[in-house]
């Protein structure tokens, strides 16, 4: 599993995390231009910025998926004894990428607020751009710092879930169709907050998994997101366990790994018949040659 994690990290690279850090710094510092805001409220405003999350963070998360969306070769899969074991361990492993992205963002946001006065209260100046959102969050969280922690953890889990969903889509449809499906889902996420007609439809897209306050619009919205996510998880688990990789040969090997894989590939009926024909041919040739010599 460690080797698989290293491979996916190498495929992913660290350029996206650097881009996230730079973009997050720019977005966060621009939020300081309003002035008159405490440190805790500043970091909460940065981590909950709809435009930053929708048009910058979400594309980076989706682009990260395509670094490891393809299945590994059969020799790698056979090391895990079953396909569902391979998929689950790969999904758990790419969680490290979600942790790195979240840690980079958190570090950038915390750095951007250096120098601001401390004030872990909800009192906000009238007319502030965050007033509408903060008035909603004030009813759910005891302090801005608590809300910041919850938003960060939700984004971490949401990124990991998006990775798994994209991997699942990628297996069934292939990279070409996965790109099209992901683009459609992203467009739906991007226009969701702009079109009230779409908000009234009980749909769950990437934005609901990544942005916590997108689940606060309607009383039933958290239930819709939770039910859809549960349905997705059950579908993924069922398909991984019973339906996935049905076209591959079901190997029943006492040992697993590269040696077992190549033994299976070499010991086919065709190869065995060829081997027997060669042995019989050599035997007959030697026998006939020995008889002629006598």
Short names for language-model regions:
Residues 72-73, 168:
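A residue-level signal for alpha-helical anchor/packing sites in multi-pass solute transporters
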Residues 85, 177-178:
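Residue-level recognition of membrane-helix boundary sites in multi-pass small-molecule transporters
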Residues 77-84:
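Short helix-to-coil transition segments within interhelical loops
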Residues 25-67, 88-175, 207-227, 291-293:
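Secretory targeting signals
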């Amino acid at each position: 599993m460690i080797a698989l994690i290293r491979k996916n990290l190498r495929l992913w690279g660290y350029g996206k995390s650097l881009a996230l850090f730079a973009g997050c710094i720019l977005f966060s510092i621009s939020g300081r231009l309003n002035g008159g805001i405490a440190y805790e409220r500043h970091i909460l405003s940065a981590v909950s910025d709809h435009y930053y999350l929708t048009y910058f963070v979400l594309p980076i998360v989706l682009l990260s998926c395509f670094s490891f969306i393809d299945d590994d070769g059969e020799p790698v899969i056979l090391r895990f004894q079953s396909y569902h074991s391979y998929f689950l361990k790969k999904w758990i492993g790419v969680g490290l990428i979600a942790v790195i992205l979240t840690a980079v963002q958190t570090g950038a946001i915390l750095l951007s607020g250096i120098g601001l006065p401390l004030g872990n209260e909800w009192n906000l100046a009238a007319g502030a751009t965050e007033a509408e959102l903060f008035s909603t969050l004030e009813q759910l969280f005891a302090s801005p710092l608590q809300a910041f922690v919850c938003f960060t953890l939700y984004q971490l889990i949401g990124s990991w879930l998006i990775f798994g969903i994209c991997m699942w889509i990628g297996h069934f449809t292939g990279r070409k169709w996965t790109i099209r499906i992901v683009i459609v889902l992203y467009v739906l996420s991007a226009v969701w907050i702009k079109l009230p007609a779409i908000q009234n439809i009980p749909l769950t897209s990437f934005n609901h998994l990544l942005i916590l306050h997108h689940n606060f619009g309607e009383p039933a919205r958290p239930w819709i997101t939770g039910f859809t996510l549960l349905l997705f998880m059950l579908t993924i688990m069922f398909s991984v366990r019973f339906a996935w990789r049905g076209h591959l040969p079901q190997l029943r090997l006492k040992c697993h790994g590269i040696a077992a894989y190549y033994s299976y590939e070499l010991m086919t009926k065709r190869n065995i018949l060829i081997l027997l024909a060669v042995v019989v041919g050599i035997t007959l040739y030697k026998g006939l040659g020995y008889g002629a010599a006598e």
